[in-house]
Amino acid sequence: MNLQLTLISLLFFTSAIAETFKNLDSHPQFPCKPPHFSSYPFCNVSLSIKQRAISLVSLLMLPEKIGQLSNTAASVPRLGIPPYEWWSESLHGLADNGPGVSFNGSISAATSFPQVIVSAASFNRTLWYEIGSAVAVEGRAMYNGGQAGLTFWAPNINVFRDPRWGRGQETPGEDPKVVSEYGVEFVRGFQEKKKRKVLKRRFSDDVDDDRHDDDADGKLMLSACCKHFTAYDLEKWGNFTRYDFNAVVTEQDMEDTYQPPFETCIRDGKASCLMCSYNAVNGVPACAQGDLLQKARVEWGFEGYITSDCDAVATIFAYQGYTKSPEEAVADAIKAGVDINCGTYMLRHTQSAIEQGKVSEELVDRALLNLFAVQLRLGLFDGDPRRGQYGKLGSNDICSSDHRKLALEATRQGIVLLKNDHKLLPLNKNHVSSLAIVGPMANNISNMGGTYTGKPCQRKTLFTELLEYVKKTSYASGCSDVSCDSDTGFGEAVAIAKGADFVIVVAGLDLSQETEDKDRVSLSLPGKQKDLVSHVAAVSKKPVILVLTGGGPVDVTFAKNDPRIGSIIWIGYPGETGGQALAEIIFGDFNPGGRLPTTWYPESFTDVAMSDMHMRANSSRGYPGRTYRFYTGPQVYSFGTGLSYTKFEYKILSAPIRLSLSELLPQQSSHKKQLQHGEELRYLQLDDVIVNSCESLRFNVRVHVSNTGEIDGSHVVMLFSKMPPVLSGVPEKQLIGYDRVHVRSNEMMETVFVIDPCKQLSVANDVGKRVIPLGSHVLFLGDLQHSLSVEF
């Protein structure tokens, strides 16, 4: 019997691989084709998702079930079910990193939005939603062309904990609130069937969008996946790799740094996929940690499927030695709640794990129910997708003018002006007769998008776009590549700099310095780039404009302090519209308003062990802490830094000076008993709060924002709080609200921050419980301060 099962399994797996790697069809394969297969109950759209999933699982034999446990799911020919590829990528546009997306068909490109770290610098929630929506439209269009799946493994919502991390560029930065809200907006935009205006014009005229109800029925346009769960932010550093690293995380840091983005992605974003990470967390591999994965389902209400990162189930045994055999690794993952393995490990070892009694077939069924439920919510079993709600989306909806305009706007809003001495910028294009552009990234298109970039709609370099403004523009790379190991090209760079009215030096990072599976060892500019900048600055007629590429922070203290370098602009990985956005900002057609979503540390920070996951500073061991919330050391640029060509001023119109928390607690609470016995109460523990009572204590902070300069501009208003130090580990400060507003010259506008004290004024204590410190909370708005007394 065992041998027979093994032979059947091999036949199914071989069939799946053969079908999956056929030439791509111009239309997607789909199940429930009439007349032979549409009569199955799982094809009956009048039944519930759960009923249909249960019906489908009940019809499968064990080898067929096992064939579904890989990202490349096997076909089930006798039921009319074709193979399905779960792994498609859409971090900031459709990408062909995985097998799900291909640009080898009739659709050969897709809109390349700026890398996530750049979009995050806009601090614009609406923009994040719009990007998610646009990528979803292109994803559905690609699916209709047979060139993509319906399940995409984005966004990356790990907190950018260490500036050396090679994948920090993929994240929305270092602040848990910003990361959380980016994740929610992107996922909503990506998954929601009913878009906020974005898709109305794209649905076919004969489809009544309203008849599909809203998203309360659980149906999805596409499936988004929040990754990497959890405490994953190291690729290769020292003797550690992401495959064997054990992230030792305190309960306090887990609660208020590492977990919030995932909790909100599930609770508020309703993500339909969660990806567990390679690393172990406190000694247990993330993909084998049942309490971690089940918390997402039981406490946070996760309804979707859980995938491992690619080969992360294999690492449980092969790299981490957590189990004694592959079968135990597979069993531990399935029991913990992993539904699908990116890779073939479960295909190869699940059957023997069942035969050895290490995992039951019932748990495999549980995994399949989760997988099929998501496919059913996507309409995969509802018949020919060409006749569905999105059936008319096609090549005209990819690289559309609307999407390219959106990509340009995202890049404009995300670019950050870090220095602008004596108002060097903007340049007057009518008064600039010649430009010199220096630097290996200035005329290189290959790394404009950063990691997880597909085939962009347009391929123009920074140099090409600047040439549109000043026809007499010369270029010299200075270095042969970003590593800049030699100064042999300096002479040409110096020569063109001497003869130009203005000089722009493009320096920084590319994917040779920071990427997946590669962390940085230094925070300085690579190789001899610093020397190149200084040599050019020494001969230029006017102070140099320094443009910085890359996702991670760079120590440019030398440039910050050098008067020969008049302006510094960070563009990150700006995507396909990066050159145009940069040129518009340099020449004043767009007023910059981005702010850094990360702290920029000095080179000395590399003395801190990247493997140390502690967020809080510890002076007794010389540990400076991490991110603006806890870091106590020197900074090159602080979180939220960002200049404009105009000046903004604030005025707090109204905010409470006192907040009583007494109504949050039941009469018999331990806190009230403490007070009755004359004990001092230093904080309120949220576990003791009456359910849903926090909403009654929300308050508004009304702010006037005035543009006192001569140029219209958009501006990110940031509201921080500093809580009383009544318990250990309170942040230095934390962001509790932000809003991007556009204010015309010499005008003002009002913005309102709605503050939920249970969320924005709370912190985790040393056992990971949320508490609100009592005492004076100081609210910061630029140079303004406002004291709020939180009492009981």
Swiss-Prot record:
- Please state what class of enzyme this protein is: hydrolase
Instruction: Quote the cellular component terms of the Gene Ontology held in the record.
Output: cytosol; extracellular region; plant-type vacuole; vacuole
> Where, by residue number, is the active site?
309
Q: Which domain of life is it from?
A: Eukaryota
EC number(s)?
3.2.1.-
One of the GO BP terms on file:
xylan catabolic process
What are the annotated glycosylation sites? 44, 104, 124, 239, 444, 618
The keyword Nucleus is annotated on this UniProt entry: no
| SMART domains in alphabetical order | Fn3_like
Q: Which family does it belong to?
A: Belongs to the glycosyl hydrolase 3 family.
User: Which protein is depicted?
Assistant: Probable beta-D-xylosidase 6
Taxonomic classification: Eukaryota, Viridiplantae, Streptophyta, Embryophyta, Tracheophyta
Q: List the gene name.
A: BXL6
